[in-house]
Amino acid sequence: MATTNKVYFIAGGNRGIGLSLVKELSSREGTTVFASARKPEAATELQEWSKSHPNVKTVELDVTSQQSANEAAQSVAKAVDGIDVLWLNSGICQSYYTVMEAPEEVWNAHYQTNVLGPIHVFKAFYPLLTKKKTRQVIFTSSECGSMGDFRATGFSAYGQSKAAINFTMKELSVELADEHFTFISIHPGVVKTDMNADAIKKFTETSPEMLTYLKKVTIIPEESVSSMLKVVDNLKPENNGSFYRYDGTIIPF
């Protein structure tokens, strides 16, 4: 179906930062927003929002499965002729261990969701992106994945997964440069979400210094999203391959 709207797909649009993105983008004129959830029927707040915003469509997606990603893309292709912006926001942060302490299953879970997940989704949605001229792909990343601004945080598997996805973003920015894509990674800040609440709870027990830091820098999802959208709304081809903080400053890889 042809549409003149600007079309967004938010992977992981059912809670936290992703849900705030859905709400902000769907409140704009001339937008269509697809929001994914692993179990859409359980995403009650997203479902309620979509009832009052007919430009929001929910899509079932398990990012750890290439088949699920392919099926999600096929579902979207039945509704629109292409997408402008793919925002790869799905992720987990359940690694509050040192490298020596982290169990193998924790490393595997973070790699499957935070690294292979975005790759699965991008590969599935690549044909839909090529149908539009915008061709913007946004990876929600983290400063924890920066080598150039490295800080020992105790987020071992999480930090490693974000470093890996930053590499993937950079590699894609070169591989598909001739196709006029714009890829970026963006750190949303330390955001007050259920995921970060778990981190605060953990550091209450293990690291008072980290707890103090997290409480000092934590922002609400709406602040993070409004700031990130200022970056994304103003992207230019020369920004391809960049790693940003939510406020638009550059993070070294």
Curated annotation (Swiss-Prot):
Q: Which GO terms describe its biological process?
A: cellular detoxification of aldehyde
Keyword Cytoplasm (UniProt): yes
Active-site positions, per UniProt?
Y158 (proton acceptor), K162 (lowers pka of active site tyr)
Under SUPFAM superfamilies, the record lists: NAD(P)-binding Rossmann-fold domains
InterPro entries listed in its UniProt record: Fungal_SecMetab_SDRs, NAD(P)-bd_dom_sf, SDR_fam
Please give the Gene Ontology molecular function terms for this protein.
alcohol dehydrogenase (NAD+) activity; oxidoreductase activity
- Keyword field: Cytoplasm, NADP, Nucleus, Oxidoreductase
Q: Provide the binding site for NADP(+).
A: I17, S36, D62, N89, K123, Y158, K162, V191, T193
Principal EC category:
oxidoreductase
The EC designation for this entry is 1.-.-.-
Instruction: Extract one GO cellular component term from the record.
Output: nucleus
Q: Does the keyword NADP apply?
A: yes
The subcellular location is:
Cytoplasm; Nucleus
Q: Which family is this protein grouped under?
A: Belongs to the short-chain dehydrogenases/reductases (SDR) family.
- The name under which this protein is listed is Uncharacterized oxidoreductase C663.09c
Q: Please tell me the species this chain comes from.
A: Schizosaccharomyces pombe (strain 972 / ATCC 24843) (Fission yeast)
